[in-house]
């Protein structure tokens, strides 16, 4: 009788093993085997991290094996099991791989396809078509869209982490408990001793150093020492944790009535301000989005304030970007003066602090939350709903949505919900952050997620004109490496544009993103369908780049740039100044966050800047969803390209007092998971 050798690999994460009964049956083109209990006498089967082998003898020839059925039945208590893969050695000596990489929970039957990626058109056998359809029907019941707030991209229909499908939950929920992590952060940073003085002001700038430990020889220390300097202020718009707002100014806005006479002491080329604009030396950052946003009112004991500044910047003869004019609100007038570097020291400093605070709010809520977290969740939900596990695009993307839906669900549960942690320290808490996302949706376009196009749209593409924009330089390298990789994978499975156009599952995936993620907005520019291999490759590059590189660029620098409180105040306790010549150091300190909010803020940016335990970085694919040699070779080339980028960035950083490493591929996690 024919005999098969079955190898079963159990996951190595905590509680991956099981004591439940595991049965296996084989489905072939010529018949189906009986159920076989996988059990070895005097042996503990399916332990965490184990690879177990079993001989399975069948009564008759089964033909080509098409499916493997796994049944899990309760032994004593339900015991979840994480199955990595099954391999089958046939009586003819052939090896067949059946990837799984998911949790098997309860008393269930799981059906596995072999690991070869297949488009829908490749499945001509009824049982395979049926399996494909049933998998998507089941997933669409599990992964349901929900509107968390009006106007937001839709998210997963789950009130809390434990409501999620087991496959997308964190291995340990404790590791992503925001309350626990923030408390741990404050303990690690030795700042919980200040919490009893929650609403008291600091005495002066030096007083902030009491909560600033463990920073020797770090970017944080450099920020603390140089934050008041105009060069450091300008540098952050290029290479800080929000390097996406600065744009070349092609015309001075009417709402900022700045003149040459006002700024001539800052201009170094003996040109008028208008001539500097024409020569491309003037840049602008406009926080119009914040105009009219409600400030946090959740604490009746502390008034909090927001501004909507406009900041004009200048490229000096050293090609460095420096601020030359700041107006703290959108409508010009006598009580909304334009602050200048030539003003009194504390006037100018407070104006810059207001800009830094506004930048913090836009960074946290729009650049970070909306444009990486929420967008990546949309891609993840659409993928699970519309692409079966056998689809090549599912196999390509699944690593890049790992834990994303889970981290966002935890954020909605603890962080950005009503009365959540975000409300404790941020002026945009208490609902302002919701208003911001609703406003910013109109600017969330497909083109703005295409990295090269986004850089060009802001007039920031020239390396000769703007030589110190490392976010742009490194981002373009990583974008091109991802684009090359996705193009290779697409070409393996789609031999022509027509195959792309005629792939119904792919088109449903793209349409789901448009309809539910972008809420069917034509102005978003998101495609409803893809019609060519080139377009598909670009689309996949957007998905992967957003989840990996873009998130890394705007997330992991938060402690570096935001931990020195005066450089990134999460709230301001007095309104913007309405006149010049009245600001004192005491007024600035009383405007900055109090001790308690400073501590909450510091704990938050520390916790958010940490990599996950056992982090998987860009190009690492330990779960082998693909088994075909051409794709594995493409992955190897991808990793080689990424290693070359790591070397280029490391070599440049050797010469820099202020290194930029957020887009070094060895520091870019595969997915949004923190």
From Swiss-Prot:
Regulation of this protein's activity per its record: Undergoes a sequential loss of the oxygenase and pseudoperoxidase activities which is dependent on the structural characteristics of the substrate for the reaction, on oxygen concentration and on exposure to phospholipids and calcium. 15-HETE and other 15-mono-hydroxyeicosanoids exhibit the highest inhibitory potencies in their capability of suppressing 5-lipoxygenation of arachidonic acid, whereas the other HETEs, (5S,15S)-dihydroxy-(6E,8Z,11Z,13E)-eicosatetraenoic acid (5,15-diHETE) as well as octadecanoids, are modest or poor inhibitors.
Effect of residue 447 to S: Increases arachidonate 5-lipoxygenase activity
Pathway connected to this protein: Lipid metabolism; leukotriene A4 biosynthesis
Modified residues (Phosphoserine): 272, 524
Cofactor list: Fe cation
Cofactor: how bound: Binds 1 Fe cation per subunit.
Binding site for Ca(2+) 1: 17, 79-80
Main EC class the enzyme belongs to: oxidoreductase
Essential for stabilizing binding to COTL1, annotated site positions: 103
Effect of residue 359 to N: No loss of activity
Subcellular location: Cytoplasm; Nucleus matrix; Nucleus membrane; Cytoplasm, Perinuclear region
Recorded superkingdom: Eukaryota
GO cellular component, one term: perinuclear region of cytoplasm
Ranges where the Lipoxygenase domain occurs: 119-674
Quaternary structure (record): Homodimer. Interacts with ALOX5AP and LTC4S. Interacts with COTL1, the interaction is required for stability and efficient catalytic activity. Interacts with PIK3R1; this interaction bridges ALOX5 with CD40 after CD40 ligation in B cells and leads to the production of reactive oxygen species (ROS). Interacts (via PLAT domain) with DICER1 (via Dicer dsRNA-binding fold domain); this interaction enhances arachidonate 5-lipoxygenase activity and modifies the miRNA precursor processing activity of DICER1.
Name the record gives this protein: Polyunsaturated fatty acid 5-lipoxygenase
Organism: Homo sapiens (Human)
Gene designation per UniProt: ALOX5
């Amino acid at each position: 009788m024919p005999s098969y050798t079955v190898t079963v690999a159990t996951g190595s994460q905590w509680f991956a093993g099981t004591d439940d009964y595991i049965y296996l049956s084989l489905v072939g083109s010529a018949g189906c085997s009986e159920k076989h209990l996988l059990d070895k006498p005097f042996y503990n089967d399916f332990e965490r991290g184990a690879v177990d082998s079993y001989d399975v003898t069948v009564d008759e020839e089964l033909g080509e094996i098409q499916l493997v059925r796994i049944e899990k039945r309760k032994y004593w208590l339900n015991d979840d099991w994480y199955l990595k893969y099954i391999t089958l050695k046939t009586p003819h000596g052939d090896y067949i791989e059946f990837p799984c990489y998911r949790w098997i929970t309860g008393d269930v039957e799981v059906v596995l396809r072999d690991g070869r990626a297949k488009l829908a058109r490749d499945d001509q056998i009824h049982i395979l078509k049926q399996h494909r359809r049933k998998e998507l029907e089941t997933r669409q019941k599990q992964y349901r869209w929900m509107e968390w707030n009006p106007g937001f991209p839709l998210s997963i229909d789950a009130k809390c982490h434990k409501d999620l499908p087991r496959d997308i939950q964190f291995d340990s929920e404790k590791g992503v408990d925001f309350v626990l992590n923030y408390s741990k952060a404050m303990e690690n940073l030795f700042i919980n001793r200040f919490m009893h003085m929650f609403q008291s002001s600091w005495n002066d700038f030096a007083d902030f150093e009491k909560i600033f430990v463990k920073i020797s020889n770090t970017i944080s220390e450099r920020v603390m020492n140089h934050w008041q300097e105009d060069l450091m202020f300008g540098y952050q718009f290029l290479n800080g944790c929000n390097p996406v707002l600065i744009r070349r100014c092609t015309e001075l806005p009417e709402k900022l009535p700045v003149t040459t006479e006002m700024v001539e002491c800052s201009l170094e080329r003996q040109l008028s301000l208008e001539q500097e604009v024409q020569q491309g030396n003037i840049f602008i950052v406009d926080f119009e989005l914040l105009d009219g946003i409600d400030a946090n009112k959740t604490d009746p004991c502390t008034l909090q304030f927001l501004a909507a500044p406009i900041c004009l910047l200048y490229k000096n003869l050293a090609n460095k970007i420096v601020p030359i004019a700041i107006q703290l609100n959108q409508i010009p007038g006598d009580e909304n003066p334009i602050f200048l570097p030539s003003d009194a020291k504390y006037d100018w400093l407070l104006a810059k602090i207001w800009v830094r605070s506004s930048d913090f709010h836009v960074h946290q809520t729009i650049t970070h939350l909306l444009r990486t977290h929420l967008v990546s969740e949309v891609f993840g939900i659409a993928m699970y709903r519309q692409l079966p596990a056998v689809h090549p695009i599912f196999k390509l993307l699944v690593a890049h949505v790992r834990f994303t839906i889970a981290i966002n669900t935890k954020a909605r549960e603890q962080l950005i919900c009503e009365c959540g942690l975000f409300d404790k320290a941020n002026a945009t808490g208490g609902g302002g952050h919701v208003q911001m996302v609703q406003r910013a949706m109109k600017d969330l376009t497909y083109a703005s997620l295409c990295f090269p196009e986004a850089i060009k749209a802001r007039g920031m593409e020239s390396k000769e004109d703007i030589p110190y924009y490392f976010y742009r330089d490194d981002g373009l390298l990583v974008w091109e490496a991802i684009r090359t990789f996705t193009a290779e994978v697409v070409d393996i499975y789609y031999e022509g544009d027509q195959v792309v156009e005629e792939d119904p599952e792919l088109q449903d995936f793209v349409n789901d993103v448009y309809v539910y993620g972008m809420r069917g907005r034509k102005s978003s520019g998101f495609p409803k369908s893809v019609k060519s291999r080139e377009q598909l490759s670009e689309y996949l590059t957007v998905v992967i780049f957003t989840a990996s590189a873009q998130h890394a660029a705007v997330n992991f620098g938060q402690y570096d740039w935001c931990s020195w409180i005066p450089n990134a105040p999460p709230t301001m306790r007095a309104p913007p100044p309405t006149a010049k010549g009245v600001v004192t150091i005491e007024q600035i300190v009383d405007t900055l966050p109090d001790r308690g909010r400073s501590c909450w803020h510091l704990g938050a940016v520390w916790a958010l800047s940490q990599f996950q335990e056992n982090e998987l970085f860009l190009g690492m694919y330990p779960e082998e969803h693909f088994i075909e040699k051409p794709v594995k070779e493409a992955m190897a080339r991808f990793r080689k390209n990424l290693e070359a980028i790591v070397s280029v960035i490391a070599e440049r950083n050797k010469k820099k007092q202020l290194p930029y490493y957020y887009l070094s591929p060895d520091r870019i996690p595969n997915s949004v998971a923190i």
